[in-house]
Amino acid sequence: SIISNNNQQSYDYLIQYLAHAIQKAEDKPGVAIVLLSDSGCGKGTFYTLLNKIWGRSSIEVNDVKHIIGNFNAALQNNFIVFMDEALFKGNHEGMERLKNLITEKTIRVEKKYMQAYDIESFHRFFAASNSEHFAHIPIDDRRFCFYRVSNQYKQNLDYFEKIHQLIENGHQVQGFLHYLQHLDIKTFNPRSRIITQEHIDQRIKSLKGFERFWYEALQNHGFSFISTSHRLLTTDNIDWLEKPFFVATETLLLCFNQYDRQSQRYESIQSQQISKIIKKLCPDANAIKHKSQTFEKEKRGYRLPGLFRARQLFETYFGCKIDWMQITDTEIKLEIEAERIAESEQEIMLDAYHESLDET
């Protein structure tokens, strides 16, 4: 329960994952378990349990180079591979190698002064890290299952001493092993791993470029979270809760470039690219020309749906629910009223269209 942070769904998946490793060792799961927490929360103790069950066919490495580097003999004759203090943030090449190791049925092993050779792989990979951001996790990731380990017993030496005593007690481990051997996993598919809140958080932390910028805009109800001395935020309806919400393409570009300079991490974007990206992140956005008191001339831009709808569309793109910043009751009322006005405008436009058809 400590590893699963008292989440029943997470606990069930982990127990069945371990049972699968016992009962169907020849069926490589294609999913790695990643444990994240502060130091002293029990990640190492979990490996002690794994080592007690699998013994000499388990290995703990403190340097991921022993697994993803040129010389990876540690993979030979080991079934459980536990990478302690693993961190792949900024290590794109290493991450790609790890992904291949997690899924490939045959992997290449290389020892010093020996020719590389291929072995059949049934490995179960585990990783533990104290870092808040383990690695760049893409939106469509299917190889990792993340666990936020509970800090309930953080640095509690007495508690973990008792756990270690239980693990060293052969009867306790034998009982647990018997349980795993006889657990019903007929309907369990390790590839259908659960999406934990930690998995969502890792994916959010991995957003970059315009995706990251758009996410921040959705979280902050608009683009005013960007600090700038330019007349950037004087455009009509820059607060997303005002309707109808129009944002000029040049405003989006300027806002993003300002955000880009602040972050100094994301690739720059051109105005012609915005349309394609907006359609992915917010399919309901309509490209239109708009003129207002603020604009001397008509400007090209986008009429965006309500904030709630825009968030829903981003969740669809993202593939799961997101914990958005709360909106006040007053803001909710404004949003509901804005949606009502938008619907009325649509009805008026439809009526006008039908009248024009009748006239013809």
Model-derived regions, located:
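DNA transaction DNA-binding modules
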Residues: 38-39, 186-360
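Conserved catalytic/switch belt of AAA+ P-loop NTPases
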Residues: 95-117
